[in-house]
Amino acid sequence: MQYLKPINVFSEIGRLKKVLLHRPGKELENLTPSIMKRLLFDDIPYLHVAIQEHDSFADTLRGNGVKVVYIEDLISETLSNDDSIKEQFISQFILEAGIRTENKTRALKDYFCNMSVNDMISNMIAGVTRDDLKNYKSDSLNSLVNSEYPLIIDPMPNILFTRDPFASIGHGVTINRMSTKTRHRETIFAEYIFKYHPIYKDNVPIWYNRDEDTTLEGGDELVLSRDVLAIGVSERTESESVEKVARKLFEQKISFNTILAFQIPQSRAYMHLDTVFTQIDHTTFTSFISDDMKFTIYALTYDVSSGSIKVKSEKAKLEDILGFYFGCKVNIIKCAGGDLIHGAREQWNDGANTLAISPGEVIVYSRNHMTNKLLEEFGIKVYQIPSSELSRGRGGPRCMSMPLIREDI
């Protein structure tokens, strides 16, 4: 089936037809113990095994009829046919990498311009070391003071999690303002893809942009149905951003009539809504709830006559709230069945971060064996992938993927 729109995502569970990934690369080998926390990693993955695990993920998707595209290929296609756009992109990337001195900027421009576009993108993601710019010399105070730091531009290891920099909603996208400085550059790629790529330019409405002054990340955005969108208010996404997206969607008269704002604790363990809540079938969800992880849910609707957004606090249980908006009884499968120890362990390793590839079929990390067994007992078809290295970045199958096209349900 051919889709008239390049973005078509009106659910979390419609059969996945096209998805965006990033295959791990040298950026993981430029992680060091001194910078990994700042770059949001809890440990240093072993690249060779991380690639094997990610290839298993991509092969599982392809084996189920999903077209896999890689972000580095999309941005390379965007820049390859217009030198002026490429030069603009390079300048913006260098500036947003925190480079301010004229000599260093010139050296980096020369470095990036003297390679193919594909290699340039790979090296931008990998980060630039002092050894990469062997001909660059500077006696500025800044360079001398920081001469022991091996990196001129930090690597971008979090681009592995393609879910976050932008999010597909309906026929459009939010291009997000990331919460942490280290992830800001990731959204430059989305900006250029949707502005200049021949498939996406002029064809994709933008519901939110990266120059907004409040943060929004894709792991907090879940398209529950054509009518209902869920957005987390979390460590990474601010409540003001939820209202901005809601107003844009309501005023553009997109199909969504309700935005459910899920407030969750501001915690590394629960950084996004999809670390504690995902949809896996028409009426079935995975979730993690504990003494320190509870949902507070607000419903945002639009009053057409006044042009105002109405906000109502939902007081019922999660399953009852969802049941009301879905118009039927729903099932909640808790991580490890709600076991205090195993539930917390498996949530930490993304047991609730499932990726639905069609209704009732999900990709999960094999390590979360208790949760996976429960899914199978509920009749869910479970595709398990290895994750000893991928999980070190605190993201699961949903985090590592951005659906571009899903079949309507």
Curated annotation (Swiss-Prot):
Which top-rank group of organisms is this from?
Bacteria
What biological-process terms (Gene Ontology) are attached? arginine catabolic process to ornithine; arginine deiminase pathway
Name the keywords, alphabetized.
Answer: Arginine metabolism, Cytoplasm, Hydrolase
* NCBIfam families from the UniProt entry: arcA (TIGR01078), PRK01388.1 (NF002381)
Indicate yes or no for the key word Cytoplasm: yes
Name of this chain's protein? Arginine deiminase
What Gene Ontology molecular function terms does this protein carry? arginine deiminase activity
Q: Do you know which PANTHER family this protein is assigned to?
A: ARGININE DEIMINASE
In this protein, the active site sits at 399
Task: Report the EC number(s), separated by commas if there are several.
Answer: 3.5.3.6
Reactions catalysed, semicolon-separated, are: L-arginine + H2O = L-citrulline + NH4(+)
* A GO CC term assigned to this protein in UniProt: cytoplasm
Give the pathway annotation.
Amino-acid degradation; L-arginine degradation via ADI pathway; carbamoyl phosphate from L-arginine: step 1/2
Which of the seven top EC classes does this enzyme belong to?
Answer: hydrolase
Where in the cell?
Cytoplasm
Protein family per UniProt:
Belongs to the arginine deiminase family.
Q: Which species does the entry assign this protein to? A: Borrelia recurrentis (strain A1)
| Disulphide-bonded residues | none
Q: What Pfam families does this protein's entry cite?
A: ADI
